[in-house]
């Protein structure tokens, strides 16, 4: 007898007698591949969250994440669809690369929505340059030498 079920991740219908599956919860099934992809995505997201929290603790000089910062992070994740790694990179961009001070932060990370797009463009341009120069050998690169001659000024007598 066929047991048709729907994968909760990819939403495709499959027969659980013919394909390997994982029972995610009672009466909820998923392909084995879909479940493993989702599990690895969740592990990566958790690692990104831990890295963000450690960076914020170091940045603001606190011993823990304050409720204000936690609420800001949750707002950015839910309303703006930012990622944990994106928020961390935006903070790194604003405070370390741009060299801004944390004194005006007032114990929060409210600057993130204002610098997120700039940080994204900055890191995207770095990624693009790495992709473009991936197959180039830096040792063989010889810069072109340009000789500029400047005539000495003439004295007016």
Feature annotation, model-predicted:
Residues 13-15, 38:
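Cys/His-rich microdomains that often coordinate metals
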Residues 15-24:
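Canonical RING-type zinc finger of E3 ubiquitin-protein ligases
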Residues 24, 28-82, 146-157:
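Long, charged low-complexity interaction segments
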Residues 85:
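The conserved phosphate-sensing helix
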């Amino acid at each position: 007898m066929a047991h048709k079920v729907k994968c909760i991740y990819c939403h495709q219908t499959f027969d659980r007698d013919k394909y390997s599956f994982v029972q995610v919860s009672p009466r909820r099934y998923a392909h084995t591949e879909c479940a493993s992809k989702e599990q690895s995505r969740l592990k990566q997201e958790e690692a990104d969250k831990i890295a963000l929290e450690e960076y914020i603790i170091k940045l603001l000089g606190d011993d823990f994440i304050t409720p204000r910062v936690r609420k800001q992070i949750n707002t950015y994740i839910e309303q703006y669809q930012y990622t944990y790694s994106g928020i961390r990179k935006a903070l790194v961009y604003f405070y370390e690369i741009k060299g801004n001070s944390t004194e005006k932060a007032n114990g929060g990370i409210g600057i993130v929505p204002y610098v997120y797009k700039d940080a994204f463009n900055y890191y995207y341009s770095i990624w693009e340059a790495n992709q473009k120069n991936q197959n180039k050998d830096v040792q063989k690169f010889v810069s072109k030498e340009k000789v500029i001659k400047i005539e000495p000024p003439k004295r007016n007598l």
